[in-house]
Regions:
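Zinc-dependent metallopeptidase catalytic helix centered on the HExxH motif
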Residues: 1-25
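C-terminal, non-catalytic "cap/extension" segments appended to globular domains
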Residues: 1-4, 10, 30, 34, ...
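Long, K/E/R/D-enriched contiguous segments that form extended
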Residues: 20-31, 39
Length: 169
């Protein structure tokens, strides 16, 4: 869609949609929630008890760690963990962030390499559930055992934000 945009206003709008509807929720929000969930599961694995207040404290600490000094954490933000009860049926939120990271890498490879990368992606999809996520991603040419795909995705998000600023002039 972005390639077919004819005005800077259209391009800015589309870049804004990429950030707000795709990457912020599915990459950032789910990444934060996955990190939080991992911290809670550490307590469970250690057979430690916890209360709703403990869960709120852990969520607030997660937000503070993720955003640092750049974002003011409003009172009540620590209660966000309560809004999606289905997240606690297995490790759920990280799949959004991981999937979007893999998809961003594959998209980048298709743009750079063309058909060979697209063919790898189709072969990876055809694997279905015959391999674990690491194996399927590897078949697509993405090594999720390193931080490179994550860093590349963050770099892509930065580029889209730069484009929003560029099209705002």
């Amino acid at each position: 869609f972005l390639e077919k945009a004819t005005t800077d206003q259209e391009r800015r709008y589309l870049c804004g949609q990429i950030i707000s509807r795709t990457y912020f929720h599915n990459f950032v929000t789910h990444f934060i929630e996955g990190y939080y969930q991992r911290e809670v599961y550490k307590l469970i694995d250690a057979k430690e008890g916890f209360t709703a207040d403990d869960l709120s404290r852990i969520f607030k600490e997660t937000l503070q760690k993720f955003w640092g000094e750049d974002v003011e954490i409003n009172e009540g933000s620590e209660l966000t963990w309560m809004r999606q009860p289905h997240y606690y049926m297995g490790l759920y939120p990280y799949t959004y962030s991981a999937g979007l990271t893999i998809g961003t890498q594959v998209s980048k490879m298709i743009v750079e390499e063309g058909k060979p990368a697209a063919d790898r992606w189709l072969k990876a999809l055809a694997l279905g559930s015959t391999q674990d996520s690491v194996g399927i991603a590897k078949a697509a040419g993405v090594d999720i055992t390193t931080d490179k795909p994550l860093k590349d995705t963050i770099e892509y998000i930065g580029k889209v934000i730069d484009d929003i600023e560029k099209y705002d002039k």
